[in-house]
Amino acid sequence: MKTINLFKSILAIVAIALTTIIIGCSPEKPENERDKKLHEDPIRAVFTLQEGTLDNVTTFDKQPKKANFKASSVPAQVIEWQTTAGEGWHRTSQIEAFNVKNCIDNPNVVYLLKMEYYNAKGEMMNSQFYNLGQDKIHQHFFSTYKRVQYKGQTSSVRVTNKADLPYDYRYIDELNGAFIGETNPMGFDGLIKFVKPGRHFELSVDLLHAAESKF
C-alpha cells in the first residue's frame, strides 16, 4: 500500500486540517495491478467544504440526505492537491486548510464535504469507484489522532471514543439518484459539523480499497 499525507495545517476558529491518506490498491501480483483494480489512479484530489444548514436542526442526528442541505451564501472553501513524478503529492491551492464554525456557538451550521478525484486526462473519476462493483470495496473513513507518551516516546493514537471527537460526520452518498449513505456508505459526499469550540485538529481522510467486499 502507498499512503500519501496531503493536508497538514492549523486553523483559526474551530480548526480542521485535513490529513488525507489515499491508499493505493496492491493486489497479490503487482504485475497484474492494472488488470485487477478496475480503476485508474487519481492524480488530482479536490476537497470542497460548503457551509449551510439543514431543513431541521434535528435531521443531522437522524439520517440526513442531500435534499435536506441548503448551502449558505458563504463561498465554498476548496483545497486541491496533485501528484507529479518529480514532487509526488503536493498542494496546488492557496488554501491550506478549512476555517469552520463550531455547532455549539452556531447550532444551525453544518457543512457539506465533497471529495472529487481526477485522472491523468483531467477527467473526474469518482464514477470509477462505483462502477463494476467497485463500490463494494471502496469507502472513505474519517479519523483524528492524539499524542500519547509510551515508554518515553511520543506516539499518535487514533481517537476511538466518539465523545472525544471534535467533529461528527454523516454519509449522504447517492447512486443514480438513490440514497445509499446508510446501506452503502462511500464518503464522496457527506455532512460534517464541528462539536468542540476553540479546537484545531487534523482530520485523517482515508480512501480505502479493500481486498474483500464490505458487505
Language-model region placement:
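Bacterial Sec-dependent N-terminal signal peptides
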Residues: 2-3, 19-47
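Bacterial N-terminal signal peptides that target proteins for export
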Residues: 2-12
